[in-house]
Amino acid sequence: MAFLSSTLHSLGIFEKISRIKEVLKNRLLDLTKRRDQAREQQRKRPHTIIQGLLLWSLPVSWIRFLWRQPGEFPVTAFLLGAGTGGLLAIGLFQLLVNPMNIYEEQKVVALYCLASLGAIGWGTSPHIRCASLLLVPKMLGKEGRLFVMGYALAAIYSGPAANLRSNINEVIASLGCTVELQINNTRSAWRVSTAPLRAVFKGMVGSKDSLNKEIQNVSTSFEEMDEQVKSDAGYSSEDWDKNRESTEMFGTSRVRPYLSTQMVYELRTRLRCIHVVNKAILSCYRWFDKKHKNCMRRIHLPLFNNMICVPMKFKFLCNIAKVIEIWCYKRIPVEGNFGQTYDSVNQSIHGLSGEFSANINLKEEKQSSMVGLNTTNWEHMGTEVRDYVRQQETYLQWAMGLLHVLLSCTFLLVFHSAFSYMDHYNWDIRFDNIYISTYFCQIDARRKKLGKQSLLPLRKAERKTVIFPFKATIQAWEMRYVIRELLETLPIVLLLLVLCAIDWALYSVFDTIRQHSFVQYSFRSSHKLEIKVEGDSILAKLLRKTIGALNTSSSTDVETNNMPCLPQPISLNARDYFKASLPTLLLVCLCLAQAFGYRLRRVIAAFYFPKREKKRALFFYNEFLKKRSAFTKLRRAAIVRRANQQKAPPHYLVEALYRRCPLLHRFMRQRCVVCQAMETPDSYVCPTPDCKALYCRSCWDDMQRLCPVCTPREELSSSAHSDSNDDAVYGD
């Protein structure tokens, strides 16, 4: 045994065992001390409701972790904080960044950055954790309302505004379609009505070669007639010159008369007639001469032959033919309009002798632009209107994308507001220090137990300057901010109501137009034209080739309607109106919940900074004690002002209404000059003749039964005589 003991001593086994015992003993004492501290913490009265609820509901180990000292559980605190911060950052990414219209690579980079910052911040800094939780009540404040207002505007745009614009675009497209339909119907009617005439023209143009052949035949035939008219046969040139000179002698003018075709042809016909008469006389002369010679040749007796052949000498009988010349002058067989007809036919024949050709020219007249559209072709009006509508929708979609980006950026204001509140909470002891907290009540109860001056219950006038965080109603101090926020929300509500009303009204109008604007277009036309040209002459053939082309018949029956052009308005159902108004209703609810959200800010900040909360509550209590001691003097200026307003004579209209309308008496009662409560039968009126200030019973007791209006300043309880400028402010 001695050897074993010496061996163990030489190896230092006993020293190591003793050291292990010391370490275990110290750890056991430390655990016992911490357990005692936890039990003492549990036995100690909590300073906040949150602390009390956590002590009541959580196990001891969790309580030790939550209210740990600096440096305790560093690894656990970092891991839990990093995990929580990373999850919150991912949720924030899904809410703000993921809806953006950006590249996926940029979204991945933003996700990694947000998750890293959230994990590091929550794992290392309580200020980051506090500011992150402050986002919840800040979302109920004006910053959150700004964020929700963007979604409200987006919902209004995507709901009634988008539907309103869609219906207006539908009507614009309907107008363009109607104009295009009318133009097409007019064009179709014009084409149908002019189709026979165009067919005639095309037929004439198509029969150009045959017409040219017929015209050449007519020209050839007319040349023979023209040669006959212009021929000099049947008379001698001497007769022509002699008769022409005699014709010119009839003219009284010195100017050589113009011989028309009619006169020339009559002259030539007359000369031919006279020439025939003269030839007849000459033939008669020759016949008598021939017969006289034959007679003389047959009768050889000289005397007898002269006597017997004497009748053959009666050539004067041939002059009887001169009588016919009178007929040549008086009854010449020439029509009176032959010359004019000949000239017309001659001119026509020479005109037809040219090549027959026809061209159809269409002239297009461009009208001015219509309804603001720079249309260059009526046929494309509907297409241009639809393109214009699509272009406007593209611009609006781009604006909506920009609005979504701006909405995501507005969340930065919420972050800034949360950090700003935390900084003001830690550095400005008066900032948002108007709450009657649990620790405030504990201080007052402890002072009351020690017999010192206490503050609770507060006076009636004092209750309007503080906030009781456990009351479920909106208090006077909070009400002014709630009313202001509701007034700021009123334009959004009015915009929603006006757009919904306009959308419903326009839908009703457009639907009525659609139901009662159906138009049926009917176009019916028929014709049958038949021209018969009889005869086998050249002119008849020519007329059959030309005028005969008019022998056409057609029957047209066109029916169309404006059903494709009628507007098809879209109406919003109850679900659409609810989706459009839900963000606006949420905005109004946020205005009402702002007071409770602002109370939650102080609770979160007090949980992370309990020592700072104790200092703030103690400062607020001491400040309240000072104000209580000088309550009368601090409120004197406001009391005197209200008393002077009550003594002022009312407006004559108000006085007349007061006399004539007994029902208005309850609304026109006077108020307490301290707390502004309505006059009751228990109210006290100052008996001083020139004062007559009204007090409720509780305020009169708080004034120690001294009227600040008519009591000299030196007799009041303090030397202060004006409102304090160092009051705590409400953290807006």
From Swiss-Prot:
Say yes or no: keyword Lyase present. no
Q: Describe which pathway this protein belongs to, using the record's wording.
A: Protein modification; protein ubiquitination
- Major localization listed first in the record, in broad terms: membrane
Tissue occurrence:
Expressed in testis.
Observed effect of gene inactivation: Knockout males are sterile despite normal mating behavior with ejaculation and vaginal plug formation. DCST1 and DCST2 double knockout males, but not females, are completely infertile. Mutants have no disturbances in sperm migration into the oviduct, acrosome reaction and zona penetration. Mutant spermatozoa are capable of binding to the plasma membranes of oocytes but fail to proceed to membrane fusion with oocytes.
**Residues with attached carbohydrate:** N184, N217, N346, N374, N551
- Could you tell me what this protein does? E3 ubiquitin-protein ligase which mediates 'Lys-48'-linked ubiquitination of STAT2 and induces its proteasomal degradation thereby negatively regulating type-I-interferon signaling. Essential sperm cell-surface protein required for sperm-egg fusion and fertilization.
Protein's name in the database: E3 ubiquitin-protein ligase DCST1
Species this protein is from: Mus musculus
UniProt lists the gene as Dcst1
